[in-house]
Amino acid sequence: YVGSFLIWQQPHFIYLAELVYRANPSDEVIKKYNRLVQETAEFMYAFATYDEFHGRFILKGAIPAQETLRAATTINPPFELSYWHFAMQTAQKWRERAGEKRNLEWDEMIDKLSPLAYNEDHLYLASEDAVDTYKDIRFTSDHMAVLGSVGILPMNKLIRDDYMKNTLHWVWDNWNWGKTWGWDYPMTAMNATRLGEPEKAVGALLMDKRTNTYLQNGHNYQDGRLRCYLPGNGGLLTAVALMCAGWDGCQVKNPGFPQDGTWDVRWEGLKPMP
């Protein structure tokens, strides 16, 4: 029953609508999608719980993208926190584009959303309750979703750049890479790109692991049971686009590739990511 408890797909509509608007910033796009953007944000606001004792909003009762965690005990998974922050801010932008006032309750949640939890080594946890993240292999297998908090998504105030770099380095050296999926490699590449580590970005895409295999027909092979895995293909295309075109505010040309003259990168028609 994993799928029933996943919440990380909920903001997808807002993210995709934002990409459509950025490709065609018009009233037509706003009229077509704004109602669904707002209704998605209404659910996201209602799903979050206000922790009165600590004066913060938390996410709980869900299985995170790293599916080895349990819904009954998981509090504040990092990727979901970051995605909530991004999507709620984006929904507010859509209100303004549509000539509507910002929702003050949503602004309060954006302001009081819990920061990502970390341990004494300044490594981000798989979730706030997973204090043994770096001791229990259950937490260091499957998707390293903590890296998606910055990479798939832009940096935000819930995250410290230095702690996220610490986390990337630990994952790179110690993760149970034999228990990963095809989109984990582009997710790692996007994280490394945003953190200014292009060598690791390229290295992640070229990592010699079974689930990072692409067959001659282009399919991302996982195993004999799962010979085509489209999330890997989508992740690869997204990662390369970010590595080439960058993101809002990025000043580095081709930020996902080493800047030492060894790469001649050519591309066209790509747009920066949020």
Each language-model region and where it sits:
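Surface beta-strand/loop "capping" patches
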Residues: 254-274
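A general structural signal for short secondary-structure junctions and capping/turn motifs
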Residues: 4, 49-50, 138-141, 270-273
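Acidic/histidine-rich catalytic neighborhood
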Residues: 39-97
